[in-house]
């Protein structure tokens, strides 16, 4: 599951007390997730990742992760990891609540389109026309979720688990060698 957002009505004071009392779970939403689910985590939305998840998290480059609560986890040295309580409390939007799993409509391919980025999902089959991504539109991150494909422009072979940073000046022509699912992130 993923922990995303505060429940409606949770105030800064209530959340601070829950942190002191180790009762954070009562203040947050826990979403059961399955492969392919998408949740847009807006800036200021408290979130955490439960064990057993492999996620794609798109975020601004930063040397800091504000850890407000650590769910009883410890670091590799066996000691509790550093928390950033005050910084976290300052950055959490306490008026933001009730996030939801993004609904993926058959035939639709845009998972999120916000001011920071756009992410689209594509499913390609062998024999389909190549997916054409024009040069000069945006730099792109291409994430291969399943299958195998070739960038006909560069000759690069891409398979499940590969991530490919495509420069602004470079286009791509992606052809499936086997059924493939990929995410393309741009406009960042």
Positions of predicted regions on the chain:
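Active-site region of the double-stranded beta-helix
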Residues: 1-35, 45, 49-100, 104-142, ...
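Short, surface-exposed secondary-structure boundary micro-motifs
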Residues: 38, 44-45, 169-170
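C-terminal structured interaction module
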Residues: 151, 155-188
